[in-house]
């Protein structure tokens, strides 16, 4: 995507005056229309967001906006030292595949080391989080049913748009909407 397309997209998201299919990134509107039959997205297609807390990149490939209610899939960059706070999903199983980096994974208060190529499975209702004091992380995440993608849409912003300034209470309220709780 060229700079002009990115600036245009950022502007459209900022004014919020268009319907979702008109404002979605390249490939997502096509995927949304094709969801009942399935779809194929290229490497640069999908919904790109910037995390509200650590400004890491999130790339949603499959989720509720593309017609999948049973599965969400994407990648998340976790910047050096940012970690992921302890939380749980009341209705969703979650899995991570570590594409880059290493750190400590906390699952129900037990600490586990992980590294590139590792896999983490989290059954619903399990408290979990990450610490990455030495490396930036790139994680592939899968949720079933979909839901995490909606949390990201409600808390994060497209590239080029200022991050949302959310209070802990606002984050917890949004999390509850997606059957998620933070400690």
Located regions from the model:
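Ligand-binding loop in jelly-roll beta-barrel domains
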Residues: 124-149
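C-terminal segment of N-terminal export signals and the immediately downstream linker at the start
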Residues: 25-54, 160
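Short, conserved beta-strand element in jelly-roll/cupin
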Residues: 78, 91-105, 142
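Short acidic-glycine-tyrosine-enriched beta hairpin
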Residues: 110-124
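Acidic/histidine-enriched, glycine/proline-rich intrinsically disordered or flexible terminal extensions
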Residues: 153-183
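A short glycine-rich, His/Asp/Glu-containing loop-to-beta-strand
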Residues: 47-86, 92
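N-terminal secretory signal peptides and thylakoid transit peptides that target proteins
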Residues: 1-19
């Amino acid at each position: 995507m060229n700079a002009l397309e990115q600036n245009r997209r950022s502007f459209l998201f900022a004014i919020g005056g268009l319907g979702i299919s008109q404002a979605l990134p390249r490939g997502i509107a096509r995927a949304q229309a094709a969801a009942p039959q399935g779809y194929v997205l290229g490497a640069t297609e999908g919904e790109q967001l910037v995390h509200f807390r650590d400004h890491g990149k999130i790339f949603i490939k499959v989720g509720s906006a593309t017609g999948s209610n049973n599965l969400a899939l994407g990648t998340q960059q976790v910047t050096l030292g940012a970690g992921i706070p302890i939380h749980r999903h009341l209705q969703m199983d979650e899995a991570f595949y570590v594409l880059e980096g290493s750190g400590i994974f906390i699952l129900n208060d037990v600490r586990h080391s992980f590294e590139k190529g590792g896999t983490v499975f989290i059954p619903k209702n399990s408290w979990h989080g990450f610490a990455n004091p030495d490396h930036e992380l790139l994680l592939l995440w899968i949720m079933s049913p979909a839901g995490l993608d909606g949390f990201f849409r409600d808390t994060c912003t497209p590239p080029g748009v200022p991050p949302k300034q959310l209070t802990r209470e606002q984050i917890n309220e949004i999390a509850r909407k997606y059957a998620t709780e933070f400690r």
